[in-house]
């Protein structure tokens, strides 16, 4: 999971990406372009945000989601599944609802994650 900082990934996640995404390690350059060395498995990405993004209530752009899609595809991860807890800096009751929605989503995908692990 990751928060959104200044419309995109926080510095700590960017540092991790820079350490992992390496030519001849996590991707190779071919005549057809970059080819990831990882076998694509489902990747579940939780995003937390103080405001709203990617909806009719949005007050901020979302550069995080397209960036993660592009950079993870570079290393071979194409099956990305995003879910979010938005508006976390707002009214306490809304935060409780968002938190419960995120928890419900995680509980619903739990069996899917377990099945993915079994197929590894």
Task: Walk through the language-model features, giving the residues of each.
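Glycine-rich phosphate/pyrophosphate-binding loop and the adjoining helix
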Residues: 59-120
């Amino acid at each position: 999971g990751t928060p959104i900082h200044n419309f995109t990934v926080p510095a700590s996640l960017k540092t991790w990406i820079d350490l992992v995404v390496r030519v001849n390690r996590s991707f190779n350059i071919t005549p057809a372009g970059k080819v990831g060395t990882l076998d694509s498995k489902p990747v579940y990405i939780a995003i937390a945000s103080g405001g709203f993004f990617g909806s009719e209530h949005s007050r901020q752009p979302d550069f995080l989601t397209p960036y993660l899609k592009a950079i993870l595809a570079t290393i071979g991860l194409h099956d990305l599944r995003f879910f979010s807890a938005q508006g976390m800096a707002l009214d306490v009751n809304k935060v409780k609802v968002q938190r419960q929605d995120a928890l419900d989503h995680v509980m619903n995908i739990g069996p899917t994650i377990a099945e993915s692990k079994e197929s590894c």
